[in-house]
């Protein structure tokens, strides 16, 4: 199915800038009409994990809309083995450099500075005893499925009506599922006051469109709700610069996807981590090594 013509007209108007202090729905409706505004907002529900992206800052939504509809090969890279393989490589490299990694240990106080705190804001609030560590984020129901493979299953589905999304990740990386099976992951932003069960029912209807007969083919299933764990959302009048600062003072630095750093989704975490690490190195009085790192 092709996207609405009004939406196509909108995303090809790439030289326009959007205001920070207006909501996206009213701004986009004024320039492109209500149909395009609704379709664009629902498309952006996929990358904001929010059921009503139209309420967000027009500049925030517009930047992301232009990113995800850019007329060039997508920036997505599928790493063989998934994120767990990336984390394993990072951990191995860190240990090679002398980093001591402890897992399964509860952290209830900060060590001597300089220190980097890389966690979601609710946990950072408690650890830093700082109630100002707040920002808006999404709320979405998640569904992971293992199904028997069948020809004709969709690789990806974007729901322009309800902002849902589905992707069959074992298509580009067959190592994610046993032979003859597929790994499917889907998400649906929850509406205000909507229960997990109601959100799952809407999401399951989307799954049926992309993976017909999935219920009788399912060999493994899990579901969850992600609340405040899907990145920062900027309301009208706010930008990434208004989010909680990376440098908290006294040698404490905060990194994550809801702090004052630019980027889309995981890019915020990466950019904030680089800035926080540089700040910590400087606070420790260590000369920063700018030599390129072997990859």
List each model region and its residues.
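Mid-domain catalytic core of redox enzymes
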Residues: 105-196, 243, 294
